[in-house]
């Protein structure tokens, strides 16, 4: 049996090679497929300013692991749920500003930071494509940006390796 998050450990050529297996697995379990964060959280045009890598943090002048991707919207500032789940936490964080966490499955969570405001409350159930927040400039961010992470059992994985469907959610 192929578990969908095994895809996170593959490099890009392997990801392409195993995409068919993953899609077959998801078709066999449509409930899991509805929950997994398989699309980007921004619907319209955006620029990716930082990727999942080691980055220099100008605020503390050190290289640090960047465990997500930073997206700057060029049109719509609304953040949409990339998969179904429950809002498990909304809170202020010193570095990340206003943050939101979605619990998609027992093992999979997504994290959103630097928000202007949330459009949901803790405990809310969301479906893929529902508006959940507005991109902002809270915390230590260089401007209006969304910091987005996918976590499996608490460990960050590269969100760009996990997207299966087209970026736009028309």
Placement of each model-derived feature along the sequence:
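Non-catalytic extracellular/periplasmic "stalk"
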Residues: 1-47, 51
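Catalytic cores of peptidoglycan-degrading enzymes
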Residues: 43-170
């Amino acid at each position: 049996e192929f578990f969908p998050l095994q895809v996170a450990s593959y490099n890009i050529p392997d990801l392409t090679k195993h995409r068919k297996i993953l899609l077959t697995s998801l078709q066999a379990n449509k409930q899991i497929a509805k929950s997994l964060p398989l699309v980007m959280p921004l619907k319209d045009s955006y620029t990716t300013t930082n990727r999942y890598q080691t980055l220099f943090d100008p605020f503390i002048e050190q290289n640090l692991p960047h465990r997500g991707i930073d997206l700057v919207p060029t049109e719509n500032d609304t953040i949409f749920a990339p998969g179904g789940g429950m809002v498990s936490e909304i809170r202020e964080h010193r570095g990340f500003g206003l943050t939101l966490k979605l619990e998609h499955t027992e093992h999979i969570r997504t994290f959103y930071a630097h928000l202007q405001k949330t459009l949901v409350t803790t405990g809310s159930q969301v479906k893929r494509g529902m508006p959940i927040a507005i991109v902002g400039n809270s915390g230590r961010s260089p401007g209006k940006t969304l910091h987005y992470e996918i976590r499996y059992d608490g460990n960050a994985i590269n969100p760009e390796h996990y997207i299966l469907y087209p970026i736009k959610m028309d």
